[in-house]
């Protein structure tokens, strides 16, 4: 018996990619985080951050939670806030999809949009606006996925354990997109302890500095890559970064939908493109896992639309 929706977070399935990776010698698998109740990997950390704050006495029902997010953490927090009785304000850049905003509002949270081009320390950025609101609203708290150690700890203890349960030590490479860095830091550290020689690969959009390079510019893929290094991100865990552009990200995502039947989001295309590149070095019988962070629900008017792709010179 499941007594509330938060108990369904985690234990997401792993499936073999039979079409898109058929040219590779190795086996390629995908962990489908869209099966979480809010639709993404961020449900994991949203629940964990709320749970940690409750156990420490930092927050109590009726308080206001505030978070700067690209959307999926906002949905996860809105889910938790709805179940547990918190007010929630999500501060999100304008670039992020309308579907994310509508989902967050449906769960009862408030949305504030900020300029996409505003850099991390700009007074108009979603980070700065969240801090300003926190200083003005009594009994408000920023859980702060960018600095909260519950983020990588959750992936170290739970996500990585699920991977070990599925593969044991028979896994040679894991590929993930990098946003806050929580998933790759937590999963990477745990798997490197348990599986000697495993390669941890990060997917990073052109325009982000996380995977190298100092040229910061806008891009369409949501939820990965930034113009600053989050405090919780331990880049030493990453063996290699693969830089990915919007065109390759979205074309790969569309292929995953059409050829594999996986209704995934745009950054899943970036991670899979990186996996297909990195896994060229693997041999027959070796195994590569790519973590696909969310589903297509948040992007129904974006990359799956031919018109949107044409408007943005991507096809």
What are these regions (language model features)?
Residues 1-315:
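PLP-dependent amino-acid enzyme catalytic core
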């Amino acid at each position: 018996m499941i007594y509330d929706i938060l108990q369904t977070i985690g234990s997401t399935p792993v499936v073999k990619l039979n079409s898109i990776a058929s040219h590779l010698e190795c086996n390629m698998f995908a962990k489908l985080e869209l099966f979480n109740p809010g639709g993404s990997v961020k449900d994991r950390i949203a629940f964990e951050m709320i749970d940690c704050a409750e156990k420490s006495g930092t927050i109590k029902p009726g308080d206001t939670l505030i978070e700067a997010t690209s959307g999926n953490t906002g949905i996860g927090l809105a889910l938790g806030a709805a179940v547990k009785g918190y007010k929630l304000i999500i501060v999100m850049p304008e670039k992020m999809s309308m579907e994310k905003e509508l989902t967050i509002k449906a769960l009862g949270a408030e949305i504030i949009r900020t300029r996409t081009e505003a850099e991390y320390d700009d007074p108009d950025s979603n980070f700065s606006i969240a801090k300003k609101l926190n200083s003005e609203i009594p009994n408000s708290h920023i859980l702060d996925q960018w600095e909260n150690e519950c983020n990588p700890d959750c992936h170290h203890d739970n996500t990585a354990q699920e991977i070990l349960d599925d593969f044991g030590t028979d896994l040679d490479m894991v590929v993930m997109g990098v946003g806050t860095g929580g998933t790759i830091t937590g999963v990477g550290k745990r798997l490197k302890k348990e599986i000697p020689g495993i390669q941890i690969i990060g997917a990073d959009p052109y325009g982000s500095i996380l995977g190298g390079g100092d040229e910061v510019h806008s891009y369409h893929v949501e939820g990965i890559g930034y113009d600053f290094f989050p405090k919780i991100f331990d880049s030493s865990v990453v063996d290699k970064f693969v830089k990915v552009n919007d065109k390759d990200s979205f074309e790969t995502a569309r292929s995953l939908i059409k050829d594999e039947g996986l209704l995934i989001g745009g950054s899943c295309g970036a991670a899979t493109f990186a996996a297909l590149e990195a896994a060229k070095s693997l041999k027959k019988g070796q195994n590569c896992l790519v973590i696909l962070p969310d589903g297509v629900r948040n992007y129904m008017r974006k990359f799956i639309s031919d018109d949107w792709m044409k408007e943005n010179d991507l096809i």
